[in-house]
Amino acid sequence: MSSPLTPDICIIGGGSGGVRAARVAAGEAGAKVALAEEDRYGGTCVIRGCVPKKLMVFASAYAPMVDEARAYGWTGMESGDFDWGTFHGKLDEELNRLEGIYRRLLDNSGVQKFDARAVIKDPHTVELSTGETFTAKHILIATGGRPLRPEIANAE
């Protein structure tokens, strides 16, 4: 199925680089922009790396604080067990909030979003996993990278 969309640029990848490129091209340069992302907007740092790690560190800091607070006169405070399910729910809530910000920024810039995997068929044609194809003057690949996992003991 072909789309009547003929953007000036199609960006593949909705991480930090792809979202920024889309917003600049659409909002500042006035280009017609299509952006395809197969997973979640925000990329590795926001969805899988920096933000989740910081929230885990933040959550882990509470247990020692209870003991320290008691030493400074706080009463009625108890140490407890960590509930991974509760934490994971709060983590998902925050990641959904951040992804929503990325989506709204794209919408407000006039970027047409496609929640689908994109494949380059030729120098100007993109095919989505939905079966839709369209032609763009330019295609920008902003799919990020993959982590290098060293082959050493306990690397996982």
Q: Which residue stretches match the model-derived regions?
A:
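Short glycine/serine/threonine-rich phosphate/pyrophosphate-binding segments
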Residues: 17-24
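Glycine-rich flavin
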Residues: 4-6, 24, 28-31, 36-156
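Beta1/beta-strand and adjacent pyrophosphate-binding region of the FAD-binding site
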Residues: 3-17
